[in-house]
Regions:
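Short, non-helical or kinked segments that cap or interrupt transmembrane helices
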Residues: 47-52, 89-106, 149-158, 232, ...
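Transmembrane alpha-helical segments in multi-pass inner-membrane proteins
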Residues: 259-265, 271-339
Length: 370
C-alpha cells in the first residue's frame, strides 16, 4: 500500500545537554541580533543614531559612581524578590503575589517607624521593624498556602488577588498617616531624626541593602541545593504522588515554603522603607513582584544566575527611561526596545533546549534504504 503523505519539512527535537560555552554562545548571539534589530527599528522609526541611543543607555547606569550604585540597588531589590518566589516555583506553586508580600513588609516597617519612634532606641527599632516586616510578609504568603494545602485552591488566582488587598490596605494607612493632612501621602518618615533608618556605610545608603541581598542569595542557594527542606520541595515539585510515597508531608512543605517566600519579600519591603525610600506608598513595590517571575524563570531557578538576570532587567529599565528623556521619545518606544531584547533573550532558550530536524532529501533517503 502506497503512502502518499509527506513527512513534514522539519520537526522539533529535544537536544541533549549542551556544553556551557555553546549555551552561552547562543545567548550572546541572541543579544547581538536583538541589538541589531533594535538599531534598525530606531533608525527607521525615529531617525536617531542607534549608537548614541545605546551609549545613553550605558551612561545611565555606568556613567558615574552614583549611577552604578543606583543600578546595584535596583538589581538587589529585583534579586531579592526573585529569590523569594523561586522556592515556591521549584515546588510548582505559582506565587504571583510578590507585590502584595512586599507591600505587607513595607507596611509593617512603616508602622513600626511611625508608632515606635519616640519609645524605643534606634537600634532596637530597626530590629523590631525587620522582624515585623518578615512576619508580615510570611503571613501574607502563608494565607494562600494554607488554603492551597487545606482545600487545594488555585494559588495563582489567590496570590494575585492578595496583591490588590495589600495595595488597598497600604492606601488606607497612607490616608491615616498622611502628612500634612489632606496631602494624600506620608512623605519622608522621621526625616529630622532618622529614627528607624538603616545606617549608611561610608555615606552610601545603598551598600548595606546590596550586602544583605548578596548574603541572602548565598543562603537561598545553599537552602535550595544542600538542605533537606530544599530537597523536599524539589520532590514535591516533580511529583506530589512520589513525595507522599516517600513520606514527605506535602501540605507542610507547601505552607513552609510559602512562609519562607513571603518572609523574603518582607525583607525586601523592610529594605525599601528603612533602607532607601523612608516612606510608604502603594507604588513602592514598583512592579518588582511581577518582574521577579520573569527573572526566576530566565535564570532557571538558579539564585546565582539571577544576579545577572536581575542586573540585565535593571539596566534595561534604567536605560529605557534615559533614552525617552534624552531623545524626547515616547516612553512606549523605549519599552518596545526593551521588549525586543527580552524576546530574543528568552526565545534563545528554545534553541538551547531544542533543535530543528529537517526532512531528508528523497534521493538521500532512498540511498540509505538500499
Amino acid at each position: 500500500m502506497n503512502n502518499n503523505s509527506k513527512e513534514p519539512l522539519f520537526h522539533i527535537v529535544k537536544r541533549g545537554a549542551l556544553p556551557w560555552y555553546k549555551a552561552w554562545g547562543i545567548r550572546l548571539l541572541a543579544v547581538v541580533i536583538a541589538l541589531i534589530v533594535c538599531a534598525i527599528i530606531t533608525m527607521t522609526v525615529t531617525g536617531e543614531n542607534p549608537i548614541q541611543v545605546y551609549a545613553t543607555m550605558i551612561d545611565s547606569s555606568f556613567g558615574s559612581e552614583r549611577k552604578v550604585w543606583i543600578l546595584a540597588q535596583n538589581t538587589a531589590m529585583l534579586l531579592g524578590v526573585s529569590l523569594a518566589v523561586t522556592p515556591a516555583f521549584r515546588m510548582r506553586f505559582w506565587n504571583i503575589g510578590g507585590e502584595g508580600q512586599i507591600l505587607a513588609g513595607c507596611l509593617a516597617a512603616a508602622a513600626c517607624m511611625i508608632c515606635l519612634a519616640d519609645t524605643v532606641p534606634n537600634g532596637l527599632l530597626i530590629a523590631i521593624s525587620a522582624v515585623a516586616s518578615i512576619i508580615a510578609g510570611a503571613i501574607w504568603g502563608g494565607i494562600p498556602a494554607f488554603f492551597k494545602a487545606k482545600w487545594n485552591t488555585n494559588e495563582t488566582l489567590f496570590t494575585l488577588m492578595m496583591n490588590y488587598v495589600a495595595t488597598q490596605l497600604v492606601a488606607f494607612f497612607v490616608i491615616i498617616w498622611e502628612v500634612p493632612k489632606g496631602a494624600g501621602q506620608i512623605g519622608i518618615i522621621n526625616q529630622s531624626t532618622q529614627i528607624g533608618w538603616l545606617p549608611q556605610i561610608g555615606g552610601n545608603k545603598y551598600m548595606l541593602n546590596v550586602i544583605i541581598i548578596l548574603v541572602l542569595t548565598v543562603a537561598v542557594y545553599v537552602y535550595l541545593n544542600y538542605s533537606k527542606h530544599g530537597y523536599e520541595l524539589s520532590v514535591v515539585g516533580e511529583s506530589e504522588r512520589t513525595a507522599r510515597y516517600v513520606g514527605i508531608k506535602v501540605e507542610k512543605v507547601i505552607i513552609r515554603t510559602m512562609l519562607l517566600s513571603g518572609a523574603i519579600c518582607g525583607i525586601v519591603g523592610f529594605l525599601l522603607v528603612s533602607g532607601t525610600d523612608h516612606t510608604l506608598s502603594t507604588s513602592l513595590s514598583g512592579g518588582r513582584g511581577f518582574t521577579a517571575v520573569m527573572i526566576s524563570w530566565l535564570a532557571k531557578f538558579n539564585p546565582i544566575i539571577m544576579i545577572f538576570a536581575s542586573m540585565l532587567l535593571a539596566f534595561l529599565d534604567k536605560g529605557a527611561s534615559a533614552i525617552s528623556t534624552n531623545f524626547g521619545l515616547n516612553h512606549s518606544f523605549s519599552d518596545i526596545l526593551t521588549g525586543i531584547i527580552l524576546f530574543f533573550i528568552i526565545g534563545c532558550e528554545f534553541f538551547i533546549s531544542y533543535k530543528l530536524s529537517f526532512r531528508k532529501a528523497a534521493g538521500k533517503e532512498a540511498a540509505e534504504n538500499v
